[in-house]
Amino acid sequence: MTYSLNTLNSDAAHHATRGLARYAQELGLLFGLIGLVFWGLALASYNLTDPAWTTSGNGSPTRNWGGGIGAFLADGSYALLGLSVWLCWAAGMRSWMAALARWMRGGVPEAGEPSPRLRRLSFWSGLVLLVVAGTALEWSRLYRLEGLLPGNAGGALGYVVGPFAQKWLGFNGAGLLCIALMVPVSYTHLTLPTNRE
């Protein structure tokens, strides 16, 4: 008589996701990966001469690897958040990998893992703080990169938050606060280490 792996060690209170919910989870993982790869390719191949949201282009063919849709997506992303949009892309990849790990475990939470509500709240609040601090820092320190972007360095969010921080904290104070927010927030809120041995 044979048993599948971990059958005798399974907890009766936690059952793996089955049926339609499992199928929806798999489709979500597949479409999430496709979307993240497309967004990453569109951002990586951004060109200022492509016709998009902030520009009509110069009449040449679209050079973005995502075509016209990719040009619009990359242009809008860079216009809104500047180069800090890559923080959102990296957080999206990390979130996708965490969802993949949950799917591979069958949807059964590990012992010591925080509740889904706490995990989501911590992740999203950390990401918002990280992006706000990143765009403000980009606006105040990396303004030489404006020639590569469709708008201001730090995008529209950096254009709003950066001057506010610099007005109230000064040039050095705003930079120190943004760095002080970015380093611990990116570690504590976006990683959430679990009790693994």
Question: Which residues does each predicted region cover?
Answer:
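Single conserved hydrophobic/aromatic residue that forms the stacking wall/gate
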Residues: 189, 195-197
